[in-house]
């Protein structure tokens, strides 16, 4: 239950994050979701396909909040729920990765103000929700 509540809080704060990045990350400036040259496909369309970065962010937050608001397998505590949390964290991480690699000033400004990314990474590492092999943003002093 504790992990579930932290995930919900992160999503709430990420909603504000996405609303703010939308000023510089638009469908015109970032027509596809990518980070560090790696494209990411949006699963919100039935079959995964390319989507603008801001569209991907909105779709991912919507997907995650919907799943957190519905009944998670095992009441949010078993292996099935762990797989859902891992999938959610992997997709949410991509939003931060896009901001870091394509909107660095925004990323740094937001991180200095809220520490949201650091909290996100610490939560993911503590509960084995983010495989180290998929973390493409270099460790920051607040995430190491």
Region locations from a protein language model:
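Eukaryote-biased recognition of C-terminal alpha-helical segments
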Residues: 110-144
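Extended alpha-helical interaction segments
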Residues: 1-77, 127, 131-138
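Conserved, folded interaction/cargo-binding domains in eukaryotic regulatory proteins
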Residues: 78-120
């Amino acid at each position: 239950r504790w992990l579930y509540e932290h995930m919900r809080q992160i999503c709430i704060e990420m909603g504000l994050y996405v609303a703010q990045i939308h000023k510089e990350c638009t469908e015109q400036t970032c027509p596809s979701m990518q980070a560090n040259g790696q494209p990411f496909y949006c699963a919100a369309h039935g079959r995964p396909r390319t989507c603008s970065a801001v569209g991907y962010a909105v779709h991912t937050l919507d997907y995650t909040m919907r799943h957190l608001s519905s009944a998670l397998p095992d009441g949010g505590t078993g292996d099935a729920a762990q797989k859902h949390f891992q999938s959610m964290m992997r997709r949410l991480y991509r939003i931060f990765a896009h901001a870091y690699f394509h909107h660095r000033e925004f990323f740094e400004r937001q991180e200095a103000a809220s520490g949201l990314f650091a909290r996100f990474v610490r939560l993911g590492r503590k509960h084995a929700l983010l495989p180290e092999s998929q973390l493409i943003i270099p460790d920051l002093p607040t995430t190491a």
